[in-house]
């Protein structure tokens, strides 16, 4: 992150917050119609913390995740990632910060079909400017840790659904990001495989102190995280364990 910090605008930050949203608002416009998703939303995620975001379909959970990851631009308000104010950055700077400070895991793995598991996991390291030898070493280490050491030369089409998602988790973590954002990362898997992938993410969270922010409809999985936040009518509210 040192190289990034030399070129990006410095902003005040809470020392323990890896991601912070302040007065976040998002409204979609189509012609004269305005559809507000949320307004005045605040959120802070500490280093190593695990947070579940739950809510009804269409509540804006994925939109919130995209805003936190700098994949979408808020109508108003600010998002800080690793202390950097996202709105102050160019597209190139945001992309560089995302690659080094964040990891993403989706319901669909989004692995590149023409590349092997190893090559897919190497990609973020190469994009950060490291040479092939470093990228290969880091990718092999992560693939081994997720139980795919024997499948590194296989392409996504040759992997099972659970193996593809484990490969996606390895890719998300290979640059040792401060936070991983997951949008229903186990949603396409059967219960047993989903549990395995979820356990893997928690193990890597503990080992690397990587924060997790997971959008999920599975209240059982959500209860196992440090905090559960419900997005309801444009507001975030923390749920008591008994209410999850």
From Swiss-Prot:
Keyword vocabulary terms for this entry: ATP-binding, Cell inner membrane, Cell membrane, Membrane, Nucleotide-binding, Translocase, Transport
A GO-annotated cellular component: plasma membrane
Record localization: Cell inner membrane
Gene3D superfamilies per the UniProt record, alphabetical: P-loop containing nucleotide triphosphate hydrolases
Enzyme class: translocase
Cell inner membrane is among the record's keywords: yes
Residue stretches making up the ABC transporter domain: 19-244
SMART domains: AAA
PROSITE patterns on file: ABC_TRANSPORTER_2, LOLD
GO molecular function, one term: transmembrane transporter activity
Principal place of residence: membrane
EC number(s) reported in the record: 7.6.2.-
Binding site for ATP: 55-62
UniProt GO BP: lipoprotein localization to outer membrane; protein localization to outer membrane
Keyword Transmembrane: no
Pfam families: ABC_tran (PF00005)
Source species, domain of life: Bacteria
Membrane topology term: Peripheral membrane protein
Function of the molecule: Part of the ABC transporter complex LolCDE involved in the translocation of mature outer membrane-directed lipoproteins, from the inner membrane to the periplasmic chaperone, LolA. Responsible for the formation of the LolA-lipoprotein complex in an ATP-dependent manner.
Subunit details: The complex is composed of two ATP-binding proteins (LolD) and two transmembrane proteins (LolC and LolE).
Family: Belongs to the ABC transporter superfamily. Lipoprotein translocase (TC 3.A.1.125) family.
Name of the protein in its database record: Lipoprotein-releasing system ATP-binding protein LolD
Organism: Xanthomonas axonopodis pv. citri (strain 306)
Gene: lolD
């Amino acid at each position: 992150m040192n190289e990034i910090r030399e070129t990006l605008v410095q902003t005040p930050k809470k020392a323990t917050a890896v991601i912070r949203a302040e007065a976040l608002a998002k409204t979609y416009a189509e012609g004269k119609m305005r559809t507000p998703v949320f307004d005045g939303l605040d959120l802070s995620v500490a280093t190593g913390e695990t947070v579940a975001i739950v809510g009804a379909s269409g509540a804006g959970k994925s939109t919130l995740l995209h805003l936190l990851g700098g994949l979408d631009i808020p109508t108003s308000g600010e998002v800080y990632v690793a202390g950097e104010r996202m709105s102050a950055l160019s597209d190139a700077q945001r992309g560089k910060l995302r690659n080094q400070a964040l990891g993403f895991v989706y319901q669909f793995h989004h692995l590149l079909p023409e590349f092997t598991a190893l090559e897919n996991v190497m990609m973020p390291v190469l994009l950060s400017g490291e040479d092939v030898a470093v990228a290969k070493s880091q990718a092999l280490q992560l693939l081994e840790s997720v139980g795919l050491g024997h499948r590194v030369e296989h392409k996504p089409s040759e992997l099972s659904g659970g193996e593809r998602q484990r490969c996606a988790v390895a890719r998300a973590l290979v640059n040792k990001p401060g936070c991983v954002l997951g949008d229903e990362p186990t949603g396409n898997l059967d219960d047993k495989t989903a549990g395995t992938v979820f356990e893997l993410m928690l193990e890597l969270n503990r080992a690397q102190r990587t924060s997790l922010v997971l959008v999920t409809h599975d209240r059982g999985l959500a209860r196992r995280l440090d905090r559960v936040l419900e997005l309801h009518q444009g507001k975030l509210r923390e749920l008591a364990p008994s209410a999850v």
